[in-house]
UniProtKB/Swiss-Prot annotation:
NCBIfam families: PRK04040.1
Organism: Thermoplasma volcanium (strain ATCC 51530 / DSM 4299 / JCM 9571 / NBRC 15438 / GSS1)
Gene name per UniProt: adkA
Enzyme class: transferase
EC identifiers of the protein: 2.7.4.3
One Pfam family it belongs to: AAA_17
Gene3D superfamilies to which the protein is assigned, alphabetical: P-loop containing nucleotide triphosphate hydrolases
Family affiliation: Belongs to the archaeal adenylate kinase family.
Matches recorded under InterPro entries: Adenylate_kinase_AdkA, P-loop_NTPase
Subcellular location: Cytoplasm
Full protein name: Adenylate kinase
Length: 181
């Protein structure tokens, strides 16, 4: 079974996914990292930031190749983005060609209270993130739901929304494990 697990920056996805991987024994594959590894093997880039500078056509090819690699995995948790917020609007994190190759059984969205997410972002000096307000974070979480519904219509996969309550990542992880096992 291949599961796609997403969440906005600061929702606690990495913490929850570490627990899910440990409890389920299913490997976590970061989609962006896999794209980078494919690009590096092909001699296209030396670091992950260079991917953004490749032509759109090359990036689409990398998306397809990474998706095909994931599609060959019997069990995998795919760590990626449901939608990507840009200055020009929201982009799909899983365009049609990626959805088709990954062939996920379930899309999981990890959510948290937008005020808590904002506080986590503000208190994380290790990341350079855009300064988004609570309303903007709320909107992005809502958009992730809309994108997940659209992906579900196309793929037939189920959609599960999991709350990551402050200080309780184990509860969120347990709920996810029940869905993906």
């Amino acid at each position: 079974m291949r599961s796609v697990i997403t969440g906005v920056a600061g929702v606690g996805k990495t913490t929850v996914l570490d627990i899910v991987a440990r409890e389920s024994g299913i490997p976590v594959v970061n989609y962006g990292t896999l794209m980078f590894e494919v690009a590096k093997r092909r001699g296209l880039v030396e670091n992950r930031d260079q991917i953004r500078k490749l032509s759109r056509e090359t990036q689409v090819d990398l998306q397809k190749l990474a998706g095909e690699e994931i599609g060959k995995m019997e069990n995998a948790i795919v760590d990626t983005h449901m939608s990507i917020k840009t200055p020009f609007g929201y982009l799909p994190g899983l365009p049609e060609w990626v959805l088709r190759s990954i062939n996920a059984s379930v899309f999981v969205i990890i959510e948290a209270d937008p005020a808590i997410i904002k506080r986590r972002r503000d208190n994380d000096p290790t990341r350079a993130r855009d300064d988004e307000g609570v309303d903007s974070i709320r909107e992005h979480q809502e958009m992730n739901r809309y994108f997940a519904a659209a992906y579900s219509i196309f793929s037939g996969a189920t959609v599960k929304i999991v709350k990551n309550e402050e200080g309780k990542p184990e509860q969120a992880a347990d709920e996810i494990v029940r869905v993906i096992k």
